[in-house]
Curated annotation (Swiss-Prot):
This is UDP-glucose 6-dehydrogenase 5. It holds the Pfam family UDPG_MGDP_dh. Keywords: NAD, Oxidoreductase, Phosphoprotein. Substrate binds at residues 157-161, 216-223, 256-269, 334-335, 447. Gene3D superfamilies: Cytochrome c1, transmembrane anchor, C-terminal (1.20.5.100), NAD(P)-binding Rossmann-like Domain (3.40.50.720). It comes from Oryza sativa subsp. japonica (Rice). The keyword Oxidoreductase applies. Its EC number is 1.1.1.22.
Length: 480
């Protein structure tokens, strides 16, 4: 029986291994993690991450050929194929701080694999890593090999949170990068055979190691670039009276461009986009390509600009101050159908409003109060380090309350900011919300979720990103 072990039970490792176990009943799959609370959660009815369809997959396989354990060394030693799905956060200190990937967890995983292995292994990079990481990992393993052969493969994930299970069931492509040696090709074939249980052969792409590593960074950079492009156009739409939804629809009808990732918003978030672009920037700088580095930096600059522009619009519209005013925030996750708050634009928007002494009431159907307070009190990039290295008792913001009901959040509020595109926000009773808010009542729609005209008929003053401005907003100070 082939044995697979995955180091890291997070957003990538957990769902990926659950689907492999479901599709390959003859393979034993063990997900290991040093965090006991996380492993306990995977072994309970309350999984540590929210992902549509994940519960059903885990329940079907767990205890049959899918296991979750903290006994890392035992399962690594027994495995034929080891997936490494540990965090590669952005460095917060030292060389490359603020840009380069921190490979501390990857390196310690590689050293542990070398220490405990007694048989040949295929080691698979699943986390997003800088180009040439495989080379560094290979050196650690071969210098500590004790006669054991290791083959390193790159098999980057292309999951979108909120649709991860669907993406795993029907992937656009599975990418496997390996050494172009007989042993390397054999390792690639072994991993291909795992995916071939459910992925059509024409969707399994094989490349060299470096192409696979760079493809993941490039894919995320291209997606983020599209979001920043449409967000840049949204600012121009507001200035000229154009409607960004109409512009994006017209542009997306060009088959060379297509309609995906052309929704203007308050900005992109999530664990990958910013981190991977910063990593790309650092790699370009290290390879003497400053012009290329500056090009990709601009994608992040536009994203930061969009978030600050949104905050400025809120403050400017409300008589140039939100001090002491209650602002309701609907949505804190970085997008709908996930509880993930990593790099969510909501953090920057809340910080901007708190800086002007606003009172904030937050509602998100999937994010806990503890997580929100932790996110608001944490230094940038600390979110991507293991929980035990994060502040244990984050400083709670007294101006922030977290509630479990949208109507409670908006009661008595002066303004309402929609920061995540949860479907339920489209069907709220906005007449009821209006009746319970202070007047004039403002709605700032950072995800273009609501129909601005319908809300104006109720009596709201509405700002929707990239849409023609309300007469009220036109009279307020210009927002840059």
């Amino acid at each position: 029986m082939v044995k697979i072990c995955c180091i890291g039970a997070g957003y990538v490792g957990g769902p990926t291994m659950a689907v492999i176990a479901l599709k390959c009943p003859a393979i034993e799959v063990v997900v290991v993690d040093i965090s006991k609370p996380r492993v306990d959660a995977w072994n309970s009815d309350q999984l540590p991450i929210y992902e549509p369809g994940l519960d059903e997959v885990v329940k079907e396989c767990r205890g049959r050929n899918l296991f979750f354990s903290t006994d890392v060394e035992k399962h690594v030693a027994e495995a034929d194929i080891i997936f490494v799905s540990v965090n590669t956060p952005t460095k917060t200190r030292g060389l490359g701080a603020g840009k380069a990937a921190d490979l501390t967890y990857w390196e310690s995983a590689a050293r542990m694999i070398a220490d405990v292995s007694k048989s040949d292994k295929i080691v698979v990079e699943k986390s997003t890593v800088p180009v040439k990481t495989a080379e560094a990992i290979e050196k650690i393993l071969t210098h500590n090999s004790k006669g054991i052969n290791y083959q390193i493969l790159s098999n980057p994930e292309f999951l979108a949170e909120g649709t991860a299970i669907e993406d795993l069931f029907k992937p656009d492509r599975v990418l496997i990068g390996g050494r172009e040696t007989p042993e390397g090709k054999k390792a690639v074939q072994a991993l291909k055979e795992v995916y071939a249980h459910w992925v059509p052969e024409d969707r399994i792409i094989t490349t060299n190691l470096w192409s696979a590593e760079l493809s993941k960074l490039a894919a995320n950079a291209f997606l983020a670039q599209r979001i920043s492009s449409v967000n840049a156009i949204s600012a121009l739409c507001e200035a000229t009276g154009a409607n960004v939804s109409e512009v994006a629809y017209a542009v997306g009808k060009d088959t060379r461009i297509g309609p995906k990732f052309l929704n203007a918003s308050v900005g992109f978030g999530g664990s990958c986009f910013q981190k991977d672009i910063l990593n790309l920037v650092y790699i370009c700088e290290c390879n003497g390509l400053p012009e290329v580095a500056n090009y990709w930096k601009q994608v992040i600059k536009i994203n930061d600009y969009q978030k600050s522009r949104f905050v400025n619009r809120v403050v400017a519209s409300m008589f140039n101050t939100v001090s002491g005013k209650k602002i309701a925030v609907l949505g804190f996750a970085f997008k709908k159908d996930t509880g993930d708050t990593r790099e969510t634009p909501a953090i920057d928007v809340c910080h901007g409003l708190l800086g002007d002494k606003a009172q904030i009431s937050i509602y998100d159907p999937q994010v806990t109060e503890d997580q929100i307070q932790r996110d608001l009190s944490m230094a940038k990039f600390d979110w991507d380090h293991p929980r035990h290295l994060q502040p244990t008792s984050p400083t709670a913001f007294k101006q922030v309350s977290v509630v479990w009901d949208a109507y409670e959040a908006t009661k008595g509020a002066h303004g309402l900011c929609i920061l995540t595109e949860w479907d339920e926000f489209k069907t709220l009773d906005y007449q009821r919300i209006f009746d319970n808010m202070q007047k004039p009542a403002f709605v700032f729609d950072g995800r273009n979720v609501v129909d601005p005209e319908k809300l104006r008929e109720i009596g709201f003053i509405v700002y929707s990103i990239g849409k023609p401005l309300d007469a009220w907003l036109k009279d307020m100070p210009a927002v840059a």
